[in-house]
Amino acid sequence: KTLRAFHKELWSKQLPNGRYFELSVNEANVYLYHKSEIGEYKLASDGIAHSFFYVKRIAHILNQVGRDELKKILDLYYTIPGFIIFPGNQINKKVTINAARGFNARICDRFDLTLECIRRFYLGIENPLIEVLNRYSAFFNLFQSFEGYLEFFLLQDMWDDKVSKIKFFMPFDNSFPTQPIPSNKEEYLRFIQKQSEFVQLRGQ
């Protein structure tokens, strides 16, 4: 099966409100498509796990990690549990969630930080992605709550029930600093380990 076929199979299911979210691959120029009384949604695939392989700022760190290790990282991240779907259509010619995650210097494509922004969105709290998340609020409203979103997309392993917090891949102090990426080999390997553990758990 293709990644697209797996996405269709995984996310065509009942929503928290009881409605069925049927996804189609038959709409021209649309990766995944849904249209019903609950709305029209054009969805695209996006990676959960980020290796930072293409970030020049940490090229010197990657050079310290063996090629075999880098290949293992990529092999895991390019499996089904390493991906999710977001709305893929532009609204008013503005950036999509996928693009905003990558362009925002306070997120740097990290999914743990993206998920924290989504959590804050559901609570109406300011965050670095609030503008783009508000733009696609109809999509997030399908899941009724942050808990509903986590459950629908099988993200529960990123949530710590004991302290009611995201399980971040790097230390997080609520400040959303710019360039939240590893600064040395040890930080990078810890980041990769935590991220990889989540991808593996999500696939079980």
PLM feature spans:
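Generic structural signal of hydrophobic/aromatic residues within well-ordered alpha-helices
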Residues: 2-7, 11, 27-28, 58, ...
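Hydrophobic, well-ordered secondary-structure elements that form the walls
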Residues: 87
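Short, glycine-/Ser/Thr-/acidic-enriched flexible segments
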Residues: 90-93
